[in-house]
């Protein structure tokens, strides 16, 4: 059986390795648009601040090492652009195409960039990959002030680590509290006070309207005023990387692929795991988008067991 996995970070590498382990006769191939696979996404902010000193420490396995350990073939810098469900094939940006018996979509998600002026200026960053973290870390070496837009987990972790590098850091968020939708107001207030004790400034109820400056970012304009900064990090959440299958006929909600308890989609032999898929909240029993590394690993394991006939 030939199993094609699109995406090679948490979910993709997890499901591929387990599928190969369960049946060595399976032909399992990972195709990823990235240069690297299996990197520690949760460690990216701490590489920015220097708590993780070396870039190499973020990479769990190189493609070569991963292939040697698992028997899974890895094809890097291969971006999928379309899927033909009738002929069971995937086409890539470089013009190549491959056939599959089973297709696993594990393409993850990308940072949201708001539709405001200035988001493409030099000195404006998002954080999702090792390269992103390296760029932020390098740029921060030559500036004094940073503005982080977004007060959820990633935004606050980036702020903490930029502060650790000696920068003057301001976090802005349009919500009335930090960690909106994650902490209740009382707990959020306590966390806010603890963060402010480190010298990080927090401005709430501030909706981003523009990135200010010339060619380089010089701060942000919000509905409550402007804030100066030599660099801006946008931490406004992520969106699923599913545009390339938007016309495939997959059931989706807000760009995320709907799957059942075994990670099957509504199309035969097509599955989805990780940040590009919805999962079922086992408490509420409702569909939920959970772009977390832990969720990616769990869904990858569930799918591998289902395909292997364990569950």
What residue ranges belong to the model's regions?
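Beta1-alpha1 glycine-rich phosphate/pyrophosphate-binding loop at the start
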Residues: 1-72, 153, 161-183
């Amino acid at each position: 059986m030939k199993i094609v996995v699109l995406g090679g970070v948490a979910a993709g590498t997890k499901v591929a390795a387990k599928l190969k382990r369960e049946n060595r006769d399976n032909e399992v191939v990972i195709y990823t648009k990235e240069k690297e696979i299996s990197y520690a996404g949760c460690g990216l902010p701490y590489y920015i601040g220097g708590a993780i000193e070396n870039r190499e420490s973020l990479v769990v396995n190189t493609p070569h090492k991963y292939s040697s350990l698992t028997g899974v073939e890895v094809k890097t810098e291969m971006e999928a652009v379309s899927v033909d469900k009738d002929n069971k094939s995937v086409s890539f940006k470089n013009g190549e195409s491959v056939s599959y018996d089973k297709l696993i979509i594990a393409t993850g998600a990308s940072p949201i960039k708001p539709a405001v002026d200035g988001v493409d200026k030099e000195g404006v960053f998002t954080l999702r990959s090792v390269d992103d973290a390296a760029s932020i870390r390098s740029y921060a070496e030559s500036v004094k002030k940073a503005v982080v837009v977004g007060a959820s987990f990633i935004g606050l972790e980036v702020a903490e680590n930029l502060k650790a590098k000696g920068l003057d850091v301001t976090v802005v968020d349009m919500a009335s509290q930090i960690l909106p939708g994650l902490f209740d107001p009382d707990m959020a207030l306590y966390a806010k006070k603890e963060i402010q004790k480190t010298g990080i400034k927090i401005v709430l109820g501030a909706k981003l309207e523009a990135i200010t400056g010339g060619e380089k970012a010089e701060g942000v304009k919000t509905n409550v005023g402007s804030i100066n900064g030599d660099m801006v990090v946008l931490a406004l959440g992520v969106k699923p990387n599913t545009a390339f299958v938007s016309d495939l006929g997959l059931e989706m909600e807000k760009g995320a692929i709907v799957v059942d308890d075994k990670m099957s989609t509504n199309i035969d032999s097509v599955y989805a795991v990780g940040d590009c898929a919805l999962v079922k909240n086992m408490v509420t029993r409702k569909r939920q988008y959970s772009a977390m590394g832990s969720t990616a690993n769990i869904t990858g394991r569930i799918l591998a067991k289902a395909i292997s006939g364990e569950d």
